[in-house]
Every structure is written in C-alpha cells, then in structure tokens.
Amino acid sequence: MKRLLISATAALALVFAAPAVFAAAPKQGGAATITFNNDLTTLDPQVGYDWQNWSVIKSIFDGLMDYKPGTTELEPDLAESYTVSDDGLSYTFKLRDGVKFHNGRAMTSADVKYSFERAVNPATQSPGGGYFGMIAGYDEVAGGKATTLSGIETPDDKTVVFKLTRPDATFLHLMAINFGYIVPKEEVEKAGADWGKKPVGTGAFKFVEWVPGQNIKLERNKDYHRAGVPYLDNITFEFGQDPTVAVLRLKKGEIDIVGDGVPPAQFTEIMADHANKDLIAEGDQLHTGYVTMNVTQPPFDNLKVRQAVNMAINKDRIVRLINNRAVPASQALPPAMPGYNSANKGYAYDPEAAKKLLAEAGTGEITTELYAMNVDPNPRIAQSIQQDLAAVGIKAEIRSLAQAEVISAGGAGKAPMIWSGGMAWIADFPDPANFYYGILGCAGAVDGGWNWSRYCNKELDARAGNADAMVKDDEKSVRIGQWKAIFDDVLKDAPWAPIFNEKRFTYHSARLGGDPTLFTDPIHIPVNYDYIFAKDAQ
C-alpha cells in the first residue's frame, strides 16, 4: 500500500488485542464530523487505493471476511462460515442470511462473483486486481480474453466456491481487503462513470451525498447485518481543512476528529497538554521508513558499501527530528508484523565500522544521489542522512522532488538511493508476504515497480512461495518461522537501510466514545466509525 507518511497521516495500526471493550456503554444516535485537508478521489472499492478513500469506503461496503474491531483477528463478515479443502485449492463460503444492499435488494452469490470479476477486469483499472491472481481463470480475464472467472462457482444463492491454481496462505486476508468488497451490478451499471461518486454497498453506513471539495455525508444503515451497530446516525467528512485549523475547531467543539492526524508542528504541544490525555489515541503501524540502494548500480552493487550505509546512519537522531513519533527500525518488517525477529537487532550505528567496510570495499571516493520527497519533514530527514554519509566518506547530493517524480525515478531504476518518507509501504493486510513481493521480491524489481532497490534474490523468492503454500492451521507457526528467516536473509543482503517505524496518533473530541483501539484501528483507517459513538446522543 503506497501512502503519505511522516506527516501524521493515517495508516494501518496493528493491535494484537481482544475485541474492543468500551469504558462507557455505547449509545445509539448522534453524529460526528471528521475533517481532511484533501478531498477524496473515489468511493469505488475496487479502485480506491489510498488511506483517505479507504476511511469512507470501509464503512459503506463489506467483504466476505473482516477483522474484529480494533484488532487484526480475521473473522467471517458477509460470509457466515467457510471451509478449506485439504490441498488448499478450494474455499467454500456460506453467505450470511438477511444481507441487503442499501437499495434494499438481497445480496447473493452472484454479486460476489461479479465483484471479483469486476476487480480483475482490466476495464476497471483496479490497482488491486492482481491480488487475486491465484483464482482460476485470472489470466484470461486480466488478459482481456474472458469476462468471467472460471474459478468462482455459485451452486446456489448462498454458496460461493473459489478454485485456486495454487495454495496461498494469504487468501483469507485477501477476502477482507477492499478490492474484494461486494457491489451490486445494477447500481454499478446505472451509475456508469459516476459509480465512484454514487456508491451503494452493504456496509454500516449509507451514502447520502458528495459535494466535491466540501463534504461527504453518510447515514446509518438501519438494516445492517451486524445487530446493534453502527451507533452514530450520521457522519460528515469535511474537506479543505488544514490540520492546524482543524485542531482549533476541535478545541472549540466544532468537529470531532482531525482526520489527517496530529499536525507535526503542534505535536509536542498537544501531547504535553494534560487536557488531551484521554483525547489522543496512540497505536503502532505496519510501516517501515527506509532508504533504498540500487543494487544493480555501482557502488551499491557492493554488499560492503550497503552494509556501511546501514551502519553510518544515526536513526535515533532522525526519530528525534520527528518529535519521537516513531521508533528506530532494525529490519524491514515492523515490530507489529508477524515474522518480525525481535532477536535480530540489525546494523548498529557505528561510523568507524562503516569506514572500515568502505575501505575493504575498495570503491574509492563515493559520490551518489539521495532522492527524497520535498514535503516536510522529509528534506530534513534526507539532510540528516546526508550528514551521516558524509561523515564516513560518502558524498550524497539530495534530489528533493515532488512525490510523483521520486516514484517515477524509483520505478525507472534511475535513483541510486531513495528515502521512502511520503511514499513508504504500509501493509494492505497483516502478513509478512505483503511486505515482500512488491517491494523486495523479483516481481517488484521491474520498470514501474515499487522495488526501488532492484533487489532480486530468486532463492528467497522460491522460499517465499514455499512458505505461502503452507495453508493448514498446524503449519502457521512453521510458515511464519520461514518468513522470519527470509527477512533475516534480506537484512544480510542489505538492499535497504531501515530507518524507523512510525506510530499513529488520532486526536478526537471528548464527546466521542469507544475503545482507544477503534481510533487507531488496523483496518478501518483512520478510525473504525462503525463502532465509535456519541456520548451525548439523546
């Protein structure tokens, strides 16, 4: 998942906890207002691939699977139950009774089949269609040779069977991401090109209106299949609100959530104010900020040079630059991700050892370029890295550019080094596989890809494939152990210098209630609107 980071924007926060437990009894009724600086681009679940779009999409639509509120624990959603064949090549879902689209029509298995075919169809231009590449018939549909997936069968209105071409341990997670959310064909076709602005789903909230540049309004779905929720009657998302102005409005009681997060310039002040103690929710993110090194170009085709860069960078100082809103990273995986190796401390900050490695590398004087996004604090972070590299004898010129230009250079394989801030990867779902293939595997080391280091270790790719073929419950711990070993070996090859793992902070009004985990929910980002409530509801 590509997201803006290091500007307190929302992201996936992983909470290995029990489902949310409320300090006060939830109440039915009331409303909430959330502000964002920028307008949304689409509410089409098969197309939206941005945290801000997701924040609304996830309350309008549902998938076959979801996660328990405030956690990363999978559970059936539109599916009532599921079974998996012994070979891991067949998944059978029984659909929940009584599920209706917001237009009043009952959802059936035909809607499930249509929704996945729509995601894969190249005409939809879904950025997530490729996630379903293991479903039989994918190549034909994605290649424009067919419009139906042969691997999805609907024996009756309440049963959906997925036939896979290979076992994939991440498949149930894929049933919970927005690209697989269920949509009604007749509404998609009726809206045509405007479907992304006239959404109809099965979710907790119904779409009311979208005034571009101003607001989006939702109302409670009284026929929602989860009894008792949502609690709020109405939600309004206001756009064009600078986060610093939004903070002032929140203090005046005019809004309820600063959607873009705590502004960096006000972070220390807000966190130090005791009055905000119960109004700031803090959570981890499935995020790592890193420096890529293009391993196909000198001098970074030399392992010792890459290891020296890892040892040269003072991560603690960089964390202080962003007001301690992160923790130093030791490896590619963030601490909250399954497969993270707490025993692996990574490369310690050691400039003298870095100098020794550079001498052993025999590359002579090194002059290179460090690309970085030109939005604060990324230029300051890049300057800190530049100073550290200079101290060990590496001269790095900073190329401070717009996000699109940095992404273009990385995808073209032209950038020797890239600081990922503002473009870093946040997992689409809580599994180590999602932190590998696109950004460290051979599949991403192509023109237009997100593996900007161009690191391609075919042995590790094969091991990753073997790990993901382990789909049985009693193989889970073995699989995660294999992924842990894969990422340990990635660290040895040092295509990245992991810098930090950012945390998420959500600032909300005192009138909103709900467990703190709901305000940094790992899936319904930035907040799980389906389960928070208004304390002053009448």
Regions found by a protein language model. Name each.
Residues 33, 108-117, 157-163, 167, ...:
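Alpha-helical secondary-structure segments
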Residues 35-86, 117, 198-201:
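N-terminal lobe/hinge region of extracytoplasmic solute-binding protein
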Residues 37, 125, 129, 227-229, ...:
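Local pocket/hinge segments that shape ligand/substrate recognition
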Residues 68-69, 146-149, 163-230, 234, ...:
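Gly/Pro-rich hinge or "lid" segments in bacterial periplasmic/extracellular proteins
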Residues 80-128, 161, 249, 299:
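Aromatic- and charge-enriched surface segment that lines or borders ligand/interaction sites
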Residues 94, 113, 124-185:
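Surface-exposed binding/hinge segments that line
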Residues 169, 211, 312-342, 376-386, ...:
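Detector for C-terminal structural segments
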Residues 193-196, 222-269, 395:
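Ligand-site clamp/hinge motif
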